[in-house]
Curated annotation (Swiss-Prot):
The chain crosses the membrane at residues 14-34. InterPro entries: Iodothyronine_deiodinase (IPR000643), Iodothyronine_deiodinase_AS (IPR008261), Thioredoxin-like_sf (IPR036249). Residues 35-266 are cytoplasmic. Not inhibited by N(6)-propylthiouracil. Coiled coil: none annotated. Its EC number is 1.21.99.4. It is a single-pass type III membrane protein. This is Type II iodothyronine deiodinase. It is found in: Endoplasmic reticulum membrane. GO terms for biological process: hormone biosynthetic process; thyroid hormone metabolic process.
Length: 266
């Protein structure tokens, strides 16, 4: 009975956010449809270009609902011990040979390690979760790169590549500009690592930012309630800053503000 009451409470907490996300997608689809109709009526050459993919689909609804469930049941809490999730180091040539790894870390090239292995006792660790098929995450990568360049002298940075947000065999997102990626749902760790490497080939991050992939059980994704994208700051093994659920509350500006308050403006 207690479990049923708990599930009901979680559902009631999720519903407002779920419906607001659905409303946003419905409005987005409507705007895109109107634009296409106007283009057709004006006989625009671009009217028939590209396939129109609706965002508000049954696959999309399931994905949105599951993302809210993941957020509701996340293990991570602000001010508490950071979950020490298993991750896999992504080999990326000179990136790893030129990266300074915190003393005492138990990190092996291409092998399984723990998220907190990348944290040093006196420096905060900025952890950015996302995937190549997540448009908001991709659009924020230049800002993340600037963060690394500005604060790598006082903080460490880690990019965790997770399950695809919009896989080609699932809830496909419309192409957003020239830097659009297409990956299917990862069938094995090799595919996930391959997707991570292709992302970094396109967005060259500074060598001070280390790159890992979530394990195939998605334990980091679950522990941190990521779903599609999330950012947090770990300091002395505790969560010093916990970003909101993406896409609407995923913000690197707040991370910059935290770092500036702690270490000064760059």
């Amino acid at each position: 009975m207690g479990s049923a009451s708990e599930d009901l409470l979680v559902t009631l907490q999720i519903l407002p956010g779920f419906f607001s996300n659905c409303l946003f997608l419905a409005l987005y689809d409507s705007v895109v449809l109107v634009k296409r109709v106007v283009a057709l009526l004006s006989r625009s050459r671009s009217a028939g270009c590209g396939e129109w993919r609706r965002m508000l689909t049954s696959e999309g609804l399931r994905s949105i609902w599951n993302s809210f469930l993941l957020d509701a049941h996340k293990q991570v809490k602000l001010g508490c011990e950071a979950p020490n999730s298993k991750v896999v180091k992504v080999p990326d040539g000179p990136r790893w040979s030129s990266t300074v790894v915190p003393c005492g870390s138990r990190i092996q090239t291409g092998g399984e390690c723990r998220l907190l292995d990348f944290e040093s006792s006196d420096r905060p660790l900025v952890v950015n979760f996302g995937s190549a098929t997540u448009p908001p995450f991709i659009s924020h990568l230049p800002a993340f790169r600037q963060l690394v360049e500005d604060f790598s002298d006082v903080a460490d940075f880690l990019l965790v590549y997770i399950d695809e947000a919009h896989p080609s065999d699932g809830w496909v997102a419309p192409q957003m500009g020239a830097c659009s990626f297409s990956f299917r749902k990862h069938q094995n760790l090799e595919e996930r690592i391959g997707a991570a490497r292709k992302l970094i080939e396109h967005f060259s991050l500074p060598p001070q930012c280390q790159l890992v992939a979530d394990c195939m059980d998605n334990n980091a994704n679950v522990a941190y309630g990521v779903a599609n994208e999330r950012v947090c700051i770990v300091h002395q093994r505790k969560i010093a800053y916990l970003g909101g659920k993406g896409p609407f509350f995923y913000s690197l500006k707040d991370v910059r503000q935290w770092l500036e308050l702690s270490y000064g403006r760059r």
